[in-house]
Amino acid sequence: MPKPHPDWFLNLPKDRLIAEFSMWSADLVRLADDAEKIAPYADILHIDVADGHFAPALLFFPDLVARIRQVSATPIHIHLMIADEVLLSQIDQFAEAGADLISIHCE
């Protein structure tokens, strides 16, 4: 499984803006192809996760993130927009799936 360099966070560019590409607009049928296309330009892959409760859409899930991790060494940032009841279990599941950074949308 490809993984980013252990010091990926410390090695982010300091002389330009960081390019964090959202996978929301990727073609789900060709997700691996889209991840490969943007790899030379993306510092981080951004994956929004919505549960249909906290946020109205259903977006991405741990198994899909695990598949992305299998084809990409680009760091993966998970943005959780989910209900409190499942927050801790989702953090664990996305960490196990290969997330390198997890942020929580709080209100």
Name each region found by the language model.
Residues H105-C106:
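Short beta->alpha connector loops at strand-helix junctions that form conserved
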Residues P2-E96, L101:
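Conserved N-terminal beta1-alpha1 strand-loop-helix module at the mouth
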